[in-house]
């Protein structure tokens, strides 16, 4: 809209303005100006019912401080602190570590089981799974579920086992998936029906076995506070609900990265840059984690790792 600029924003953050809404609500006020405004005024509603704020309750944010990839609507003090964190660190986490998505069956009531449950097919065709409720800050994450997993490693790739091989080597599994063929084919992947694919008996998202097997950091995708955990069980994890972080630099240990991710400074940064959802939960995307300002100090690494191990 030509010559129209946002003048004020009233942010309801995670307050339950609409029943069932998961994203937060804001009110934008626009006005027409012949020249661009220098500032936008922002107010965060502390509680409901909503009381119209006075002009003095709004904080002033310079338009020049707003970036194209996303607006950080914070006070000048918070914005300066975030900028200082970025300028003081030479790298971002992505240089040393990588985020990974997990496995998604598309039909948990058919393909997911309790960890100790006896499944109606060969147990060799399952893999343990870590769920969000298994993650606690600095703790070892333990799998509480297992899923049907018809995949094998081919070099560094994870490939779907041919249906004929499943029939020959895992007859109970073959019988089980054929029994549920109609249900499995009805699953959708990006709005496309799974039955249209040759690999209809696979998972919607299957992850990567080589990354599952590595020592890794796991965390729920939506949290109120950082609760990065360590997984040494070689388990898969639920895509969308849990993500993992692995070290991609042999000199930087997973324990060092874990200490960084669970630090108060890292939590402060994420809580001021990640998307906020209803109930006070922050959504940690791979982009949010990858772009964290990060510094590796080899002189302190051994002491940091020792502290993490002894927690």
Language-model segments: residues:
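Signature of N6-adenine DNA methyltransferases within the class I
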Residues: 1-113, 239-242, 282-288
């Amino acid at each position: 809209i030509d010559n129209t600029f946002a003048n004020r924003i009233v942010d309801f953050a995670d307050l339950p303005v609409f029943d069932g809404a998961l994203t937060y609500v804001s009110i934008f006020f626009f006005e027409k100006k012949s020249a661009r405004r220098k500032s936008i005024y922002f107010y965060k509603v502390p509680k409901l019912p909503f009381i119209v704020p006075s002009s003095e309750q709004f904080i002033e944010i310079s338009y020049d401080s707003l970036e194209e990839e996303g607006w950080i609507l914070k006070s000048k003090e918070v914005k300066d602190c975030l900028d200082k964190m970025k300028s003081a660190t030479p790298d971002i986490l992505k240089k040393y570590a990588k985020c990974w998505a997990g496995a998604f069956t598309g039909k948990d009531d058919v393909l997911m089981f309790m960890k100790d449950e006896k499944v109606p097919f060969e147990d060799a065709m399952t893999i343990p799974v870590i769920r969000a409720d298994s993650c606690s800050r600095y703790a070892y994450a333990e799998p509480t579920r297992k899923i049907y997993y018809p995949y094998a490693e081919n070099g560094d790739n994870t490939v779907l086992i041919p249906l004929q091989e499943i029939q020959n080597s895992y007859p109970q599994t073959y019988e089980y998936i054929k029994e549920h063929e109609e249900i499995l084919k009805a699953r959708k992947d990006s709005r496309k029906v799974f039955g249209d694919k040759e690999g209809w008996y696979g998972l919607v998202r299957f992850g990567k076995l080589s990354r599952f097997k590595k020592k890794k950091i796991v965390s729920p995708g939506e949290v109120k506070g950082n609760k990065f955990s360590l997984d040494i069980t070689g388990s898969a994890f639920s895509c969308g609900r849990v993500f993992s972080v692995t070290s991609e630099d042999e000199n930087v240990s997973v324990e060092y990265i874990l200490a960084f991710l669970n630090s108060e400074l890292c939590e402060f940064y994420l809580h001021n840059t990640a998307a906020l959802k209803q109930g006070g939960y922050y959504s940690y995307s791979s982009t949010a984690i990858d772009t964290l300002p990060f510094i590796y100090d080899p002189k302190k690494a051994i002491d940091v790792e020792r502290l993490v191990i002894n927690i």
